[in-house]
From Swiss-Prot:
<keyword id="KW-0813">Transport</keyword>
<feature type="binding site" description="axial binding residue">
    <location>
        <position position="83"/>
    </location>
    <ligand>
        <name>heme b b562</name>
    </ligand>
</feature>
<keyword id="KW-0408">Iron</keyword>
<feature type="binding site" description="axial binding residue">
    <location>
        <position position="196"/>
    </location>
    <ligand>
        <name>heme b b566</name>
    </ligand>
</feature>
<keyword id="KW-0830">Ubiquinone</keyword>
<dbReference type="InterPro" id="IPR027387">
    <property type="entry name" value="Cytb/b6-like_sf"/>
</dbReference>
<comment type="similarity">
    <text>Belongs to the cytochrome b family.</text>
</comment>
<dbReference type="InterPro" id="IPR048260">
    <property type="entry name" value="Cytochrome_b_C_euk/bac"/>
</dbReference>
<feature type="binding site" description="axial binding residue">
    <location>
        <position position="182"/>
    </location>
    <ligand>
        <name>heme b b562</name>
    </ligand>
</feature>
<keyword id="KW-0249">Electron transport</keyword>
<keyword id="KW-0479">Metal-binding</keyword>
<dbReference type="InterPro" id="IPR016174">
    <property type="entry name" value="Di-haem_cyt_TM"/>
</dbReference>
<dbReference type="GO" id="GO:0005743">
    <property type="term" value="C:mitochondrial inner membrane"/>
</dbReference>
<feature type="transmembrane region" description="Helical">
    <location>
        <begin position="226"/>
        <end position="246"/>
    </location>
</feature>
<feature type="transmembrane region" description="Helical">
    <location>
        <begin position="77"/>
        <end position="98"/>
    </location>
</feature>
<dbReference type="Pfam" id="PF00032">
    <property type="entry name" value="Cytochrom_B_C"/>
</dbReference>
<keyword id="KW-0999">Mitochondrion inner membrane</keyword>
Length: 379
């Protein structure tokens, strides 16, 4: 008799995605991050759901409702810190996942890659709106500064900002709508994840060599299920350690002060995972130019497949491209550091240099070095 998992209409889909899926035999730990992101999303949706049961999206009570969750709700502090630090874990996994895609040439699966860029943008929007909800000083001023950037758009900018705010400043209407969108977007993200996987399973997974692996495939279960479970345990251990030992390590002390429109914090900055983009924004003196650079710093990923000039897919056998890739990583770490520093010498010039190098590396250096490596193959 045929196994029910292969015949049942619903179980068949799960079976073909998680059990009998043919996978390349050479996948390294870098292929764990997709499933880790799934776990992060599940943790965020679950903790967020329970937090939403106690949170109130009103300027008068939002800050106090978060305090109430931490002090009075059973294990409310665990929920709150799991949600806040879970977001950090989410972005660590996201950036490593994107980095893996860049290094091993996974972007040649253009549909999967483009849906991935959509996912990254949606998660970033969700995280930004979530940071506004506790209604601390950095929540309020972060929301004010970032939404105000839209006023740089010619003609419609000012009207657009006031439309998003629901008034003439960040206020009750803004908080309420941000809560509504923050609740809704993760479910849209979950739907996009399904589309992402649908496109991925059309082509099959890439592998570290970048060479087609059709002749050498193994079933996903048990080989990669056990590998993924090890990844889950490692990540959840790290998250638990962060939540239980140092929950405020990645947060901002200013957010423990209730929002006050009359008092601006000395250094307005977003959460650490947006600092690289914030540094690029600040490094351009012109407002509209800064906004365009900010948007391009993420959307540049969409043109990476067009810039692939190498005859090889993966960087595994391309040492010169590897050097440039790790230079890019160093540039992004520098930008993250600069984004958290005050706007003064020498930080401004370091940020401007790193921003220029970021775009030059992706747009010019990498394609040129790939062409050079193609010529070296003929030696």
């Amino acid at each position: 008799m045929t196994n029910i998992r292969k015949t049942h209409p619903l179980l068949k889909i799960i079976n073909n995605s998680l059990v009998d899926l043919p996978a390349p035999s050479s996948l390294s730990a870098w292929w764990n991050f997709g499933s880790l992101l799934g776990v992060c999303l599940a943790v965020q949706i679950l903790t967020g759901l329970f937090l939403a049961m106690h949170y109130t999206s009103d300027t008068a009570t939002a800050f106090n409702s978060v305090t109430h969750i931490c002090r009075d709700v059973n294990y409310g502090w665990v929920l709150r810190y799991l949600h806040a630090n879970g977001a950090s874990m989410f972005f660590i996994c996201l950036y490593l996942h994107v980095g893996r895609g860049l290094y091993y040439g996974s972007y040649t699966y253009s549909e999967t890659w483009n849906v991935g860029i959509l996912l990254l943008s949606a998660v970033m929007a969700t995280a930004f709106m979530g940071y506004v909800l506790p209604w601390g000083q950095m929540s309020f001023w972060g929301a004010t500064v970032i939404t105000n950037l839209l006023s740089a758009i010619p003609y419609i900018g000012t009207d657009l900002v006031q439309w998003i705010w629901g008034g003439f400043s960040v206020d009750k209407a803004t908080l309420t709508r941000f809560f509504a969108f923050h609740f809704l977007l993760p479910f849209i993200v979950a739907a996009l994840v399904m589309v992402h996987l649908l496109f991925l399973h059309e082509t099959g997974s890439n592998n570290p060599t970048g060479i087609p692996s059709d002749p050498d495939m193994i079933p996903f279960h048990p080989y990669y299920t056990i590998k993924d479970i090890l990844g889950f345990l490692t990540m959840l251990t790290a998250l638990s350690a962060l939540v239980l030992f140092n929950p405020d390590l990645l947060g901002d002390p200013d957010n423990y002060t209730p929002a006050n429109p009359l008092n601006t914090p000395p250094h307005i900055k977003p959460e650490w995972y947006f600092l690289f983009a914030y540094a690029i924004l600040r490094s351009i003196p012109n407002k509209l130019g800064g906004v365009l650079a900010l948007v391009m710093s993420i959307l540049i990923l969409a043109i990476v497949p067009m810039l692939h000039t190498s005859k090889q897919r993966s960087m595994m056998f391309r040492p010169l491209s590897q050097c440039l890739f790790w230079l890019l990583v160093a540039i992004l770490l520098t930008l993250t550091w600069i984004g958290g520093q005050p706007v003064e010498y020498p930080y401004v010039i370091i940020g401007q240099t790193a921003s220029i190098l970021y775009f030059l590396t992706i747009l010019i250096f990498m394609p040129l070095v790939s062409i050079m490596e193609n010529h070296l193959l003929k030696w």
